[in-house]
Every structure is written in structure tokens, then in C-alpha cells.
Amino acid sequence: MYHDFESHTITRRSFLKGAGAVGAAGLLAACGGSSSSTAASASSASSGAAASGKGLSELFTYETSGREIESWNILYSQQAIDFNVTTNIIDGLISFDNYGKPVPALAKSWEHNEDSTVWTFHLRDDVDWVDMNGEVQDHLTSKDFLVGFEWVLNAKKNQASNTSMPSTTVVGAADYYDKTYAMDDAAAAALTYDDMLAAGVGIDAPDDYTVVFTCLNPCPYFDTVASYVCCYPAPPALVEKLGVEGFRGVDYTQQWCCGPYLIEEFVSDNSKRFIPNPHYYAADECSRFERVSLSMITDLTVGYQLYQNRELDELELSESTLTTITSDTSNAYNDQLCEKRPTKYAYDFHFNFHCLNTDGTPNENWNKAVANRAFRRCFQEGLNLIPYYARFNKINPLKCENNYYTMKGVCYNSKGTDYVDLVAKELGIDGEKYDGKTMVHLRKSTADSIAALKKQAMDELTAIGATFPVKAPFFFVAGNTVQQDNATVLKQCFTDSFGDDFIQLDLGTYVSSLAKEVRIPKLHGFVINGWGADFGDPVNFVGQEILHDSNAYYAVNYSNIQLVAEDPADYQKELVDEFEQFTDLVNAANAIVDDTDARYEAFAKAEAYMINNSLAVPCYYDVRWCLTHVNEYTKINAMFGPCNLKYVNWETSEDAYTTAQYEEFAKAFDAAKS
């Protein structure tokens, strides 16, 4: 095991080997400790003055319970909780800088032909795969991208994960997926990249360090597709060694790495330790920490205790902690409160139209209610979420308001207009601006209009046998007091908005995995999930909700609308028809390949249709306050791809950054970006 870098005297690391994160918090409250004073990253010209001349050589950070990594296979996963880890051990063709601009990674350069149908990537020739001990196992060449691409497109290997992006952009990709889907498991598993090439899939490796993709249609955004994990490499020797089942379920002890870090230690639901990859190809081109120590904490309240004792170097603040600080003028952290940039995720209410009880029987009352358009529109037109937003941003809660399904900044038309502004126009809210007082969608609603919509829903549902109040199953991770408080506040929002005779949240808990304990058993009435772009086109958002596509992530995994559409009850037929119309609008927009402006206009109409029919309901943006020794404005900040939590080129300070410094960072960043 690679141990060039030693930790200092007493750290969380020694405690967490023998104790859980909760117990460790109590131990650490008595022992303090601090991070190394050696600078880990240089000052950035765009970020303003640093808090001190000393940076951190070792970073102490965290993740909250219920967000443990579930898959170490970066080709297979579609979850941020996995990418936040695996992006640090495996690189792709392209990465991004702190302004979200694409920068070289495994590809040193790339170009496309005149109509953007052929994209050529020129690979570095100095990249090696290493094992968990930092020992070189193989050299990376273009063949690794052929192996990786065949894996992704093979339905029996990658099980439809991350297939939608190449299927809609690369010649022959969808046909190859369909071919493997129709084969038996053993026959599909035996296929290799040679079979993929023979089938006419539009990827080629003319030499050891060149990869060429041929697109179905002009695709000016294909570099953003290529930045995503669907185009990542896979080491042929490792795939052969582990076999299909073994590689799909690969763990960190088996994984080969080509990224900036290795996993020194992993204790599930407890801790992770990253150390530098000794053979990292870009070691002299970026700054890295000598160690990153990540602990799983039960909630942000525990995190605050750790931060106070310098056992964490950055911490997002819960509403209660922010209140504690701001209500005491003598609190030492008052001048260190830093407002972060929005994350790249747009959070939405995702309904489950095929909800089950714990015994596997249908939750008929919820299923009837959520199939009703007026019922869903109450979420859209009558729900005041400001108290819920305050859970994330107590000082400026309405900065969290989200009115769109697609995240801002994903793509722009030829006039430089953000795509979501086109959606706003279709929704009739393009003239509405942030005022810090009222939610946009409540400005046109009145008490009478909300009451009328509620009555309509109750009358229509009573007529088909639904009973009130409708119980909406909503889950949070057990033992996480912040999530529990969030859920409690959300429940009160429904009460305050509609009374208790209409909708009531039925709060439940899961132990560690939302997917295994809630989503797969279909117990949820709705979830609030965020989606970040995999590439820079609206189809990557709205395409997740359509019918007749096994790659539509939310339609398959959360809303279960595809199951409903197979045999809808009478009360679900109108809902299915709405999804059919939405699907037609999305497919029509996606068929426009020769006029980007027209394409975006068509997608805006499709998205507006989805929102107006509340097939999913926009909820919030994640805009938090934090205490930190890390300059957020030096982190990767891309609207697409998995790279944002890669621990490279971070500017840090031994002293905590102040509110004033962060305001200067923001000004300098915006000035340099414009």
C-alpha cells in the first residue's frame, strides 16, 4: 500500500478505524487537532486574496449518512454519491476548470469536422492503470475506450445504465444495445469490442492514441457527451480477469485507477482515505492533497462539532446551526459565514405513480390521488416552500427557488439566451424576477384560486373512491436529525398551504440505502431528487421522464410510469395520455438536429407541457451557507459530467475564510468569467 504521506499526530483516522462516525464525534470533541500547514494549492488570480499564506496539505471533509457509495464501477453508476468518489480515482477524456470550461484530461486535444458529426480525440501517451497499491498494471491506450464503450452499450453487461447518451448521439449505438438486449445473457457477455465495431457502431481507434466518434447527426455538444462516464475507458485485462459479474460489481480493492488519487482505506458507512496516485500522468500539472480524509457523519449537527474542533475543513450549515451563529453577535463564526454557489443540480418532486405498501400490495389511495392532474397542480400552484428553503439557506431562502426541470446554465441558443429562459417564456413567467419575498409560482395564485383547485381535486378523487386526507409516503434516513427536521418542516408546509384535510406527509425512515429500502420496493409517494446534466443538451433532463425508453432514468426507477402505461387503471388513463403527449413533444424536439435554436424552442415547449401538467414539479436549487477553509471558486464547476468533486487545484487556507473574502472571491470570479 502506498504510504508516502504520513498523517499528523492524532487524527480522526486513528479513531475511525475502531469506532463509528457517531462515536468518533464524541471522542474528537475532546482532542482538537488541526490540518497540516503546508499549502496544497496555489492562489488563483481570479479568486481574490487568500485568508492566509498557508494552505492545507491534508483535507478533512465529510459525507452524510445515507449517501455512501453504492457502486465503484464508474461505467455502471448513475449517482452523484458514487461519482463524488470515483471521479478521484478514474479520469475520462475531458475534465473542466473552475469556470466550467472543458480542459484536457486523458485526451490532450480534440477537434470535430465542419458539421460536428465526427469527433476526434487525441490521447496522452503517458497514462498507466495502477492497482490499489499504486503498482502499474497496464498502459492506457485507445483500446481501453473501445472496451469501455462496448461495456456501456451491452445491455447484459451494463444493464442499460448510461446508455441513453451514446444511443441518441453515436451511429449504431442504439442498434447494438437493442441487439444485446435481445440476446441471452451468456451470448451477450461473450461479445467484445470487435463485435461492436463489426456491428457498425460509430467509434474507432485508428491508432493507439486516437479515438474517433461518428455521430448520427450534427452534434455540436458532443464534447460534453464525451466528458461523461458513458465514454470512459475500461482496462481490458481487468474486465477479462473479473468477468462480467465481477467487473460490474468491482470494489475498490480490485479497481484499477488512472485518476489523481488512490483509495488508501475504506470502511463502509464510516470513512474513506484518498492518497495521491504515484503514477498520475498530470502530477506536475495540478495540485493535490497529501491525503483526503472523508468521514461519514450522521448529520450536519455532528459536523459542526467536528468543524469547531478542526476535525473538518469545510461544512455546510444546517438551519439550526446557522441560527445559532447569527443570533449571537459575539459568535466567532459570524464573520466567517460564506454563501456557496448553487450546485449543478435542479431538484424536483418526482412522483411515484405505482406506489406499493410494505406488503407489496398497491397503495391505491395514493395512486388514485397522484394520477389526478388537479391534485398534482396543487403542488405547483399552492405549496409555499419558503420555510423549507430556509432549511438550506436561512438568510436568503428564495435564492433556492426553482421553477424549471432543467438546470440553469446547461445550454444557450445562438443569441446567448439560457435555455431555461425559453422555458420561462413558455410558462409565462419570463417577466418574473427574484424579489426575496414571494415565490414566483405563488404570485398569480390567490387563496380563492388555491381553494378552488383543492376542491376540484377532492371532488374528482372522491368520485373514484379516494379518501382524505391523502397520505403521501416520504422517507428520510434514520438517525439523521437534519433530514428529519427537513421532512418535518416540509410536512408543515403542506399543512400551512392546504390544511390537514387534503394531503398529509406520512414520514418514514430507511437505514442506509434509499434505493434498496425504498425506491426498488416502490414505497415512496414522492421523492425530492436533483438531476445534474450528463451533457449539454435539454434532452438529458426531460428525456429522463419519457415513456417507451428503458434508459429514461426517472420514468423507470422513480415514477414507474412505464409500468402504469402497460396496463393503466381507468383513473390512470388520462395520466398516461399526458405522458404520451409529453413523450411525443420530447421526441419531436430531439429529432431537430440541424437548427439548434429551433431544437431548444421545441424542448422548451415540451418542458413547459411537463411542468404545466405537473408530471414532475420543480422544487429547489441547493444554495447553502458554509464555514470553510476551501475557496469554492477554485473547485471544478461544470454543469455536466462527474468531475465537480475532484480534489485537484483547490485553493485552501489554514485560517478560515471570512464573509468579506468570499464576497470578493465572487466578484473576482464573475469579473473573470464575463
Where would I find each of the regions flagged by the language model?
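Detector for C-terminal structural segments
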Residues: 21, 28, 378-424, 478, ...
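N-terminal secretory signal peptides
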Residues: 1-10, 18-30
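N-terminal lobe/hinge region of extracytoplasmic solute-binding protein
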Residues: 62-114, 256-257
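Gly/Pro-rich hinge or "lid" segments in bacterial periplasmic/extracellular proteins
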Residues: 98, 186-190, 197-200, 207-209, ...
